[in-house]
């Protein structure tokens, strides 16, 4: 890069370079600044430098930025072509759930930009069953399970016929739960409903409670709709912690929740602990996991789960909530153990006093900054003498 007789900071000001990521042709360099644009009536410095130099510098900055974009775009196109060829050779079908946009990843070498597509995963129905069920423990590797004890604000059974009722639960304590058994079921005939993060406001997760007239042998079914576009059906059972849950999983991103109802629905609130234990034992023998028909509008009750506040009246019933927290199986989409974001280099010099050339090995995010450094020569004594009234930055 040729040295300039001025610094780009002298005409950039606070505006910098305008970049439109949706239209790279709209990358605009700063407009030339001349003292004649000022309101000052001073005529000592009618032109700071020649206007052609500003135009040339602006074009140079724009070329540098576009060049950094092109390096990334070329690598993305190359990887996409390779992926398409591999998919055609393997006769893979492009379903809606298979599509994933290319993801920018850190560089394996300074000369190469990598675009990674996660391996498509077919949705499966995940069921949490009791200890007597057939299980597949191979799915326990990528999740951490937390058990929370919560208090319900209303008796669920009293809200069966009330379509607009709400149930608020408050977490009391949490502990770890291990060796939870999972069964993968190929049955995908399940009514799936989704919500988006826009439905989550002020840490309140809105859910859909599907109920029917409860008996000791027919527990209620609760459906949770989470932010990962996954649906789970929760059966609060009466067997002190051995509830059932089913949910449809989309890829490897799912957060499921188990709620077990330990309330003694057929006993009065005045019963003592011995009576409660006897009722729980009786309910264990009659536990049946049932699914409610969603066509009945009376079965739809809004359930709001709050973390810090209680808004409804207390009841004597309690709920045990077990929350498996899944960790993504691939790092490009993992917010916790993914690669660190690319950052510009730490400055060890004044960019005005050191000229640094731009090379193809520079990273995508650093292109704009290095482009400014490449046309930032040290100020010379002749400039200071020639423009005594001008300030060099």
Swiss-Prot record:
Top-level taxon in the UniProt lineage: Eukaryota
Region: Disordered, residue numbers: 77-118, 259-296
Chain intervals with Low complexity compositional bias: 79-92, 259-289
Biased composition (Polar residues): 103-114
Protein name: Uncharacterized protein DDB_G0274353
Species of the source: Dictyostelium discoideum (Social amoeba)
């Amino acid at each position: 890069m040729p040295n300039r007789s001025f610094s780009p900071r002298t005409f950039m000001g606070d505006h910098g370079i305008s970049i439109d990521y949706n239209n790279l042709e709209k990358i605009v360099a700063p407009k030339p600044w001349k003292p004649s644009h000022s309101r000052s009536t001073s005529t000592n410095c009618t032109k700071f430098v020649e206007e052609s130099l500003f135009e040339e510098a602006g074009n140079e900055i724009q070329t540098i930025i576009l060049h950094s974009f092109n390096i990334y775009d070329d690598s993305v196109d190359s990887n996409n072509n390779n992926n398409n060829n591999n998919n055609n050779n393997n006769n893979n079908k492009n379903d809606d759930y298979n599509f994933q946009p290319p993801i920018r990843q850190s560089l394996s070498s300074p000369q190469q930009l990598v675009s990674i597509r996660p391996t498509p995963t077919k949705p499966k129905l995940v069921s949490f069953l009791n200890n007597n069920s057939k299980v597949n423990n191979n799915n326990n590797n990528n999740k951490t399970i937390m058990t929370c004890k919560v208090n319900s604000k209303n008796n669920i059974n009293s809200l069966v016929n009330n379509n607009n009722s709400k149930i608020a639960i408050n977490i009391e304590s949490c502990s770890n739960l291990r060796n939870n058994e999972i069964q993968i079921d190929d049955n995908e005939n399940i009514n799936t409903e989704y919500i988006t993060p826009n439905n989550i406001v002020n840490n309140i997760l809105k859910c859909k409670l599907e109920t029917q007239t409860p008996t000791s042998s027919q527990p209620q079914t609760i459906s949770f709709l989470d932010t990962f576009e996954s649906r789970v059906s929760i059966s609060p059972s009466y067997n002190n912690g051995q509830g059932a849950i089913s949910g449809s999983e989309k890829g490897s991103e799912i957060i499921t929740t188990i709620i077990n109802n330990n309330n003694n629905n057929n006993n009065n609130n005045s019963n003592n602990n011995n009576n409660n234990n006897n009722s729980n034992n009786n309910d264990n023998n009659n536990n049946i996991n049932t699914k409610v028909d969603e066509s009945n509008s009376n079965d739809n009750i809004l359930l709001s789960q709050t973390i810090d506040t209680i808004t409804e009246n207390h009841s004597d019933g309690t709920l045990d909530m077990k929350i498996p927290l899944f960790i993504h199986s691939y790092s490009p989409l993992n917010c916790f153990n993914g690669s660190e974001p690319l950052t510009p280099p730490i400055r060890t010099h004044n960019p005005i006093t050191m000229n640094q050339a731009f090379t193809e090995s520079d990273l995508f995010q650093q292109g704009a900054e290095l482009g400014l450094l490449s046309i930032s020569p040290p100020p010379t004594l002749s400039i200071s003498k020639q423009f005594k009234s001008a300030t060099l930055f």
